[in-house]
């Protein structure tokens, strides 16, 4: 399981040092092979272990290239998809187009989301968390059947 939020400094080449607690698991789970793409709803990146990404690709493959919305989704997610491999020091190289899309500079946040990570600029992450917390009192919790029975 991928969870937690970790502040990480990108090096000058755009490499992200994956926290030690995930390195062994990623090497065991997917031989250190990952895929990074853009998030179409937020200014961040999505980083999937290869086995998880392959499930996403199956879903994308089932979409119709004739439907403009489905085609746009395929184009963005697959067009930006970039294979990444953990190097010997547990780092991943994030391509310049991906870093540019998410506005990544020096300080980033690696945020576990169960089956994937989100990669945010630290500034945007803090803004997003602030917005999410402020929106909580106004949310309609009955909107989703899954949320209706959700408790912490």
Curated annotation (Swiss-Prot):
<feature type="domain" description="SpoVT-AbrB 1">
    <location>
        <begin position="5"/>
        <end position="52"/>
    </location>
</feature>
<protein>
    <recommendedName>
        <fullName>Transcriptional regulator MraZ</fullName>
    </recommendedName>
</protein>
<dbReference type="GO" id="GO:2000143">
    <property type="term" value="P:negative regulation of DNA-templated transcription initiation"/>
</dbReference>
<keyword id="KW-0677">Repeat</keyword>
<comment type="similarity">
    <text>Belongs to the MraZ family.</text>
</comment>
<dbReference type="GO" id="GO:0009295">
    <property type="term" value="C:nucleoid"/>
</dbReference>
<keyword id="KW-0963">Cytoplasm</keyword>
<keyword id="KW-0805">Transcription regulation</keyword>
<dbReference type="InterPro" id="IPR020603">
    <property type="entry name" value="MraZ_dom"/>
</dbReference>
<comment type="subunit">
    <text>Forms oligomers.</text>
</comment>
<dbReference type="InterPro" id="IPR037914">
    <property type="entry name" value="SpoVT-AbrB_sf"/>
</dbReference>
<dbReference type="InterPro" id="IPR007159">
    <property type="entry name" value="SpoVT-AbrB_dom"/>
</dbReference>
<dbReference type="GO" id="GO:0000976">
    <property type="term" value="F:transcription cis-regulatory region binding"/>
</dbReference>
<keyword id="KW-0804">Transcription</keyword>
<dbReference type="GO" id="GO:0005737">
    <property type="term" value="C:cytoplasm"/>
</dbReference>
<dbReference type="InterPro" id="IPR038619">
    <property type="entry name" value="MraZ_sf"/>
</dbReference>
<keyword id="KW-0238">DNA-binding</keyword>
<dbReference type="InterPro" id="IPR003444">
    <property type="entry name" value="MraZ"/>
</dbReference>
<dbReference type="InterPro" id="IPR035644">
    <property type="entry name" value="MraZ_C"/>
</dbReference>
<dbReference type="Pfam" id="PF02381">
    <property type="entry name" value="MraZ"/>
</dbReference>
<dbReference type="GO" id="GO:0003700">
    <property type="term" value="F:DNA-binding transcription factor activity"/>
</dbReference>
<feature type="domain" description="SpoVT-AbrB 2">
    <location>
        <begin position="81"/>
        <end position="124"/>
    </location>
</feature>
<dbReference type="InterPro" id="IPR035642">
    <property type="entry name" value="MraZ_N"/>
</dbReference>
